[in-house]
Amino acid sequence: MEDILGEWKRSHYCGNLTKADVGREVILMGWILRRRDHGGLIFADLRDREGLAQIVFDPAKNTDAHHKAEAIRNEYVVAVKGEVIPRPEGTVNSAMKTGEVEVLVTECKILNRSKALPFTLDDYVDVAENIRLKYRYLDLRRPVLQQNLILRSMVAQITRQYLSENGFLEIETPFLTKSTPEGARDFLVPSRINQGNFYALPQSPQIFKQILMISGFDRYFQIVRCFRDEDLRADRQPEFTQIDCEMSFIDREDIISVMEGLIAKIFTVAKGVDVPLPMPRMTYAEAIRRFGVDNPDVRFGLELVELTDIVKGAGFKVFADVAASGGIIKGLNAKGCARFSRKEIDDLTEFAKIYGAKGLAYVKIEEGQWHSPIAKFFSAEEIATMNQAFGAEDGDLLLFVADKPKVVNDSLGKLRNHLAGILGLADKNTFRFVWITDFPLLEWDEDEKRWAAVHHPFTAPMDEDLEKVESDPGSCRAKAYDLVLNGNEIGGGSIRIHQQHVQSLMFSMLGLSDDETRAKFGFLLDALECGTPPHGGIAFGMDRLIMLLTGSDSIRDVIAFPKTQKGACLMSEAPSPVDAKQLRELALKVTVKQ
C-alpha cells in the first residue's frame, strides 16, 4: 500500500543541495536511481530533474524509515524528510554536484512503486534507440535528456525576452491552412464539414507572417511548429520547431544585426560562450569556390583548390577531357595524411562516389616527390605549380576530383567534412558562425525541366538583377541569407517581394499559370496590392540549434517526443488506422498500395 503525500511540500530539489544546507531539515521528492544495503546503513540515490542527492537510512536513528528503505527498489517514487549532513571524510563524491553532503532520513513515504524496467536509466548505459523511443517516458528520466530539454526551455525564454525587448510581437498563425507548393509534401487534413476538401498543416508561417507585415504589425515573432511530409534523417523530423521572425521597413543589415544579437545572447546565457560580433560573412559563390557547399564548416581548413587552368593542358587525358568539355578539376590537401593506407584511400573514394564523383585521384608527397599513379602525366613545372597551389609539404595527401562543377563541389565538399571527422578537426565545443549571402534566385530543375526557387517563391531578387529575371534567370541573385554554425544551416531568411507585379513574375518564372497562381496565392496577390511595406525575415531551426548547443548527435535527443526515421511514434504507436465511422464522416475511403 502506497503512502499519501498529505501536507508534505518539497523544500529543495535533490540536485540543489550544498554545504550551505548542512543542519537544515529538508523534504525531497523524486525517484530512486539505485539503492545500496551496507548491512545496517542503507544508502540510496534520489533523483529529480535537477540531479541526485544521496539519502541515508540509519536504523539507530529511525527504525520506521529504515524499514521503509528495505522495501525500496529502483524507480520507486518516494518523499523523504531529514537533516542535511556533511559526508564522512573520504566519502566525498566530486563527480556529483551534491557530493559533499547527504540527507539523514527521519521519515520516508513510498508514493508509488515501479515494476522492473526494460533498461537502466544511467546515462552511460547504451540502449538501442528503438527501445528508448518505445519507452520514452522512461528515457526522458535520464539526466542527459532532462538537461537537453531544460536548456531548450531556457532558449525559448531567452528568445521571447530578447525579441520582446526589441519591439517584436508574438502572434500565432493558423495550423489549418491551405496547401501551397513550398518544396516538400504537405500533411493534409480532411475537412468533415467541407467534404472533399483538405486543410494542410503549415510547412512554415511564411505567407501569414508576410500578411501580418501588410497589416501593420511591423515586428513579429513566433516559436512555431511546422510540418513537412518528407524523407527523414538524423537532423529532420516531420514536425519541427522554428524561431520565426519578420520585420517591416528594413533591409538585410537590420535583420542580420538584430538576429546576431539574439544568437549571441542565447549562447552567452545558455552556454556561457561569447560570440564575437559582427559574425563573418561570405557570398554563396565564395562558399562554393572555397568549400564546395553553401553551408561550410569553418572550424577547420581543408579548403578546395581550383586546378582547372593548371592541368587542362597537361598530359593526363582524364583531366584534359573534363576541362575541354566544360568541367572543372579541384582538389584538397589532407595535411599529414600520406600515411593513409590504400584501403583508407579506397574508402575515401567510395565516399566521394556517393555524391556523384566517378573516382578520386590521389598523390602522396614523400621526400619532396609525388607518389601516385598519375604523377607520370605531369611535368615538373606543373607539379611545382600544383604544390604551391595546395601549400603541399612532405607527408601530405592530395585528393582530386574532375567532373561537372556541381559533382566536383558536392563530392569534395562532403569529403572535406568526412575527412575532418576522421582527423578530429571538428570539435563540438568550438562554435564558428558564418553568414552566407547573395544566393542564386533560381536554379534549373533538370527532372521537371523548369526553374525552381532556391529558397522560396517569395524571395526578392537583387535590385540590379530584377530587369534580367526573364532574360537571364540563372544569373540572378536573391536577397537571401543563411546563418551557418559548424557546417549546419541554423537559420535562413530573405528580403521578401513586396510588389504584386514582381511576385506575379516570380510565379510565372516557376512555371505557374495565371489560373494556378490565382487559385493558390490569390489572397496574397490581392494583399500585395493594398500598400505592402518593404519587409523581410528569418527562421531559425530550433531543434538543430539545441542539438548543436548540447553536442547531441541527433535532434531526436532534444525533442521530448520525436518520430523515428519512418515517421512513427513508437510509444503511442502513431500513425495508426482509424475506424470506419470516422472515415465515413470524412467521406474518405482508404486504398492500400500493394
From Swiss-Prot:
Residues involved in ATP binding: 228-230, 237, 489, 541-544
GO cellular component terms, semicolon-separated: cytoplasm
InterPro entries reported for this sequence: Aa-tRNA-synt_II, aa-tRNA-synth_II, aa-tRNA-synth_II/BPL/LPL, Asp-tRNA-ligase_1, Asp-tRNA-ligase_1_N, Asp/Asn-tRNA-synth_IIb, AspRS_core, GAD-like_sf
GO terms classed as biological process: aspartyl-tRNA aminoacylation
PROSITE patterns: AA_TRNA_LIGASE_II
Keywords: Aminoacyl-tRNA synthetase, ATP-binding, Cytoplasm, Ligase, Nucleotide-binding, Protein biosynthesis
Catalyzed reactions per annotation: tRNA(Asx) + L-aspartate + ATP = L-aspartyl-tRNA(Asx) + AMP + diphosphate
Intracellular or extracellular location(s): Cytoplasm
Main location: cytoplasm
Alphabetical list of PANTHER family matching this protein: ASPARTATE--TRNA LIGASE, MITOCHONDRIAL (PTHR22594:SF5), ASPARTYL/LYSYL-TRNA SYNTHETASE (PTHR22594)
Assembly behavior: Homodimer.
Full protein name: Aspartate--tRNA(Asp/Asn) ligase
Gene symbol of the encoding locus: aspS
